[in-house]
């Protein structure tokens, strides 16, 4: 009986997880790959090349020592630029 309940809960959890994580737009992966290809063809359009620092509330890998990752005027007190 316990095993049956555990299996039912596991199936429900995995079903819910799949529905939550599913991309609801049509042809989502194709759109993603076409955007990435366009950025590779046009390096000026790439956001990564334009931005060398992290903006406010962006992740910084090393707190207290990671202020060099944040843009000017921001510090990294707890894994996020503030």
UniProtKB/Swiss-Prot annotation:
Omega-conotoxins act at presynaptic membranes, they bind and block voltage-gated calcium channels (Cav). PROSITE patterns: OMEGA_CONOTOXIN. This is Conotoxin Tx6.6. Belongs to the O1 superfamily. It is found in: Secreted. Coiled coil: none annotated. GO terms for cellular component: extracellular region. It comes from Conus textile. Residues 1-19 form the signal peptide.
